[in-house]
Design a protein with these regions (language model features):
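Secondary-structure end/capping motifs
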Residues: 13-121
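Periplasmic-binding protein-like
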Residues: 1-13, 21
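Conserved C-terminal helix/tail region of periplasmic/extracytoplasmic solute-binding proteins
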Residues: 96-181
Length: 181
């Protein structure tokens, strides 16, 4: 999930920017509420959005999964998140991981300075201001710009303090100028 706006728009329209952010945040909070999941799934199932069977969408929103192997999980903690667990917060560590993945696949050069780019474009200050205007409790606002070290399902670890170590640990990648690895 990402929400991006051009810097020239943000600078020229600060009130509209905050209004847009607050509207998105309120929608995320609404979607997060279990009582609203069925309604949200019905909306998303429509042709103009996901165009998928309602049952397929609502089960995932509730955290009900049928893995097709006889393994069925209900009310999984791994259900779709919209607001809880800082799902909408623009963590700089997430930005760095996405940029690192773009380096991994050769879309950005290996020497790309992701941290400098993030410092220019990540506007978590706007998110925090919108959250404050909405009266979001402090417990729902991250204390850090980083989620810290992330461990993925395959056991790989991404430490935002050392993205090169993550890249070096990957066996499947294409790094520009180095051919397929």
């Amino acid at each position: 999930k990402a929400f991006a706006m051009r810097a020239d728009y943000v600078n020229a329209n600060p009130n509209a920017t905050r209004a847009l952010l607050k509207a998105v945040m309120e929608a995320q909070m609404y979607c997060e509420e279990p009582a609203n999941r069925e309604e949200v799934a019905r909306i998303c199932a429509k042709r103009r959005w996901i165009n998928a069977p309602f049952e397929d969408i609502v089960d995932r929103m509730r955290g009900d999964f049928d893995y097709g192997t006889g393994r069925v999980v209900q009310n999984s903690p791994h259900q779709m998140r919209y607001w809880k667990d800082f799902a909408s917060y623009p963590f700089q560590s997430h930005d760095l991981w996405f940029l690192t993945e773009n380096i991994r696949w050769g879309y950005l050069p290996r020497d790309f300075d992701g941290k400098a780019w993030i410092a220019k474009v990540n506007r978590e200050d706007l998110w925090r201001a919108a959250a404050a205007e909405l009266g979001v409790p402090a417990a729902q606002i991250p204390k850090s710009t980083s989620r810290g070290v992330e461990k993925f399902f395959d056991g790989k670890v991404f430490d935002p303090a050392n993205p090169k170590a993550y890249l070096d640990s990957l066996t499947i990648k294409h790094l520009r100028g180095q051919g397929a690895a």
